[in-house]
């Protein structure tokens, strides 16, 4: 073999090995299927991925779980707190794809590949309620801070081309929710947040107000690396086509966003104040009678019914904390609807009965929403709406599909063909949405209170440990001093004795 031939062989082998390395570093469907799991990168947050008392949750998490299940592989979430870190993990092959509510932008299209879009959002500039509302870029007079690496930066750069005075700060330390809190505390004047994320957070921070949209609506999509194989992108195209057509995406969207489209500042503030001022008196009763239910859901139902007023009364004749009819109270064995404990006991018992009446094939949380609607409008009318849904080709076991048909019970051409006739079908839709909002907000406030209690307990334990350590050290020091003093006296006595001799 000549030296030239040997050199060619070395070059060919090097190129081949390099190609193999690239093959191993890039994501491919065959590789994912072979190893039996998929790594999905995301950002911690209420729209993506978070931990609850019942396990993991989040729109992106559940959608990613659906995708992993469709491939029959294990889902392994790789969460981060930083967009920059997220992109690095994708480029280095640590994750196979990103599912984090990422906008499709011009710059990102140059660096990554995207799956089909599944949602459209707009980006809102927000400020604190009570301050002067900025209606356009020229109205911005204070500090604007956004998350580093976000699509907000790209949109701000576009705006700066026609607004040369526009300035902003980019943070690698704080996420969108933390920046919202900085707006509320007055540390900064403005920030930018996606409309879906804002809808969730305004339930917890009602003082956040919208100034204006900084862009036209943008599509959200999952992201894969530039050198990912076509097979993984093809599988994503197939997956999103399936969840679009079978109603999975619609149901998931309703679960996380369907009940928060409308925001009422006064209502939200009033509820948060009631949680702090009124609820503590009745919380033990909700916990006592909820049993297998989440007591916070029972409390949310009660707030919707009576605003936690034990003597509440409606023109329809319902009364008490859970606003029971006289007939329902008798069925539940309740003697006095105005007795707070009896009312909560009766309401809990009746709601559990509504849940039990739902067909077993209806999964949670849909069966909970159906039970709430039944609690409000009656089981018969709910079934009428489910039948209409089925006749129209919808799924009668999905709340998102039935809720759109409930208002049809007010139209003669529909209710004349039902078993139970006319009903104000819009009421249970609003009723369920309200309770879901109250429940979400109460759950968030309750979890925050628990976190603060744990933090306080840890701080107290640390303080006690430090105090105990100081006491021990002081005791040791005193003992050492006494020993030293004793030794000194003994030495003096020895010296005196020797001198006397």
UniProtKB/Swiss-Prot annotation:
Give UniProt keywords alphabetically: Cell outer membrane, Cell wall biogenesis/degradation, Lyase, Membrane, Signal
Signal among the record's keywords? yes
Active site per the UniProt annotation: 305
Q: Where is the signal peptide?
A: 1-19
Give a Pfam family name: SLT
Region (Non-LT domain) residue ranges read 20-260
Q: One cellular component GO annotation, for this chain's record?
A: cell outer membrane
- InterPro entries for this protein: Lysozyme-like_dom_sf, MltF, Solute-binding_3/MltF_N, Transglyc_AS, Transglycosylase_SLT_dom_1
Q: What is its EC number?
A: 4.2.2.n1
Recorded protein name is: Membrane-bound lytic murein transglycosylase F
Q: What is the lineage of its organism?
A: Bacteria, Pseudomonadati, Pseudomonadota, Gammaproteobacteria, Alteromonadales
- Gene symbol here is mltF
């Amino acid at each position: 073999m000549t030296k030239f031939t040997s050199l060619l062989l070395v070059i060919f082998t090097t190129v081949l090995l390099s190609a193999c390395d690239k093959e191993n570093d890039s994501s491919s469907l065959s590789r994912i299927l072979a190893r039996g799991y998929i790594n999905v990168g995301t950002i911690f947050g209420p729209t993506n991925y978070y931990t609850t008392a019942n396990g993991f949750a989040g729109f992106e998490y559940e959608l990613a779980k659906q995708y992993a299940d469709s491939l029959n592989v294990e889902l392994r979430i790789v969460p981060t707190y930083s967009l920059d870190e997220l992109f690095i993990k994708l480029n280095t092959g640590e994750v196979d794809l990103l599912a984090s509510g990422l906008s499709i932008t011009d710059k990102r299209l140059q660096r990554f590949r995207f799956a089909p879009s599944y949602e459209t959002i707009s980006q809102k500039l927000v400020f604190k309620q009570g301050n002067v509302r900025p209606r356009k870029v020229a109205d911005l007079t204070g500090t604007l801070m956004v998350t580093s690496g976000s699509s907000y930066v790209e949109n701000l750069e576009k705006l700066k081309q026609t607004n040369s005075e526009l300035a902003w700060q980019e943070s690698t330390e704080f996420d969108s929710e933390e920046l919202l809190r900085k707006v509320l505390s007055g540390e900064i004047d403005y920030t930018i947040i996606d409309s879906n994320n804002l809808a969730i957070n305004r339930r917890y921070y009602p003082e956040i107000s919208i100034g204006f949209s900084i862009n036209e609506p943008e599509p959200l999509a999952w992201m894969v690396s530039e050198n990912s194989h076509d097979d993984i992108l093809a599988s994503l195209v197939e997956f999103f086509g399936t969840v679009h057509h079978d109603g999975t995406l619609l149901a998931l969207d309703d679960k996380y966003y369907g009940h928060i489209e409308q925001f009422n500042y006064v209502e939200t503030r009033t509820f948060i104040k009631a949680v702090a001022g009124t609820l503590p008196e009745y919380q033990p009763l909700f916990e006592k009678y909820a049993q297998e239910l989440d007591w916070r859901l029972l409390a949310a139902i009660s707030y919707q019914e009576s605003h936690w007023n034990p003597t509440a009364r409606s023109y329809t004749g319902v009364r008490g904390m859970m606003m029971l009819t006289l007939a329902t109270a008798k069925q539940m064995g309740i003697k006095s609807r105005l007795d707070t404990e009896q009312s909560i006991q009766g309401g809990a018992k009746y709601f559990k009965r509504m849940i039990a009446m739902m067909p077993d094939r209806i999964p949670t949380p849909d069966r909970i929403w159906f039970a709430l609607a039944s609690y409000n409008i009656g089981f018969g009318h709910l079934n009428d709406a489910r039948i209409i849904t089925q006749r129209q080709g919808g799924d009668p076991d999905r709340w998102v599909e039935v809720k759109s048909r409930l208002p049809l019970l007010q139209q003669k051409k529909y209710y004349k063909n039902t078993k139970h006739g006319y009903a104000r079908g819009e009421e249970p839709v609003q009723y369920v949405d309200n309770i879901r909002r109250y429940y979400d907000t109460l759950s968030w406030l309750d979890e925050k209170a628990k976190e603060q209690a744990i933090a306080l307990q840890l701080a107290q334990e640390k303080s006690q440990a430090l105090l105990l350590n100081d006491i021990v050290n002081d005791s040791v020091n005193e003992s050492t001093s006494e020993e030293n003093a004793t030794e000194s006296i003994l030495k003096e006595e020895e010296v005196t004795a020797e001198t006397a001799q």
